[in-house]
Amino acid sequence: MSKKEMILSWKNPMYRTESSYHPAGNILKELQEEEQHSIAGGTITLSTCAILSKPLGNNGYLCTVTKECMPSCN
């Protein structure tokens, strides 16, 4: 990718979506299908959330561990 094309992709979101260039390459080619199915980054499991949120006073179905869903925050 030339410098001109790179700058154009920074400034133009439509061109960016059409461009297949990415500095890291195509990471999905490097991962096996089994590895792709096991990716769960940036989250906690449901059981961990339920175990931690109930003692904090959150009796809802699913909530974050932080207290934004608790009645005391409303």
Swiss-Prot record:
Q: What UniProt keywords are attached to this protein's entry? A: Antibiotic, Antimicrobial, Bacteriocin, Lantibiotic, Secreted, Thioether bond
**This protein's record includes keyword Secreted:** yes
**One cellular component (GO) term of this entry:** extracellular space
Biological process terms in GO annotation: defense response to Gram-positive bacterium; killing of cells of another organism
Q: Which GO terms of the molecular function aspect are on file?
A: signaling receptor binding
Q: What Pfam families does the annotation carry?
A: Lantibiotic_a
Question: What processing steps or modifications follow its translation?
Answer: Maturation of lantibiotics involves the enzymatic conversion of Thr, and Ser into dehydrated AA and the formation of thioether bonds with cysteine. This is followed by membrane translocation and cleavage of the modified precursor. The 2,3-didehydrobutyrine is determined to be the Z-isomer.
Which sequence positions carry the modification called (Z)-2,3-didehydrobutyrine?
48
Q: Does the keyword Protease apply?
A: no
Relate the protein's function as given in its record.
Lanthionine-containing peptide antibiotic (lantibiotic) active on Gram-positive bacteria. The bactericidal activity of lantibiotics is based on depolarization of energized bacterial cytoplasmic membranes, initiated by the formation of aqueous transmembrane pores. When present individually, LchA1 exhibits activity towards B.subtilis L1 (IC(50)=9 uM), Rhodococcus sp. SS2 (IC(50)=9 uM), M.luteus B1314 (IC(50)=1.2 uM), B.megaterium VKM41 (IC(50)=1.8 uM), S.aureus 209p (IC(50)=3.1 uM), B.pumilus 2001, B.globigii I, B.amyloliquefaciens I, M.smegmatis 1171 and M.phlei 1291.
Q: What is this protein called?
A: Lantibiotic lichenicidin VK21 A1
What species is given as this protein's source? Bacillus licheniformis
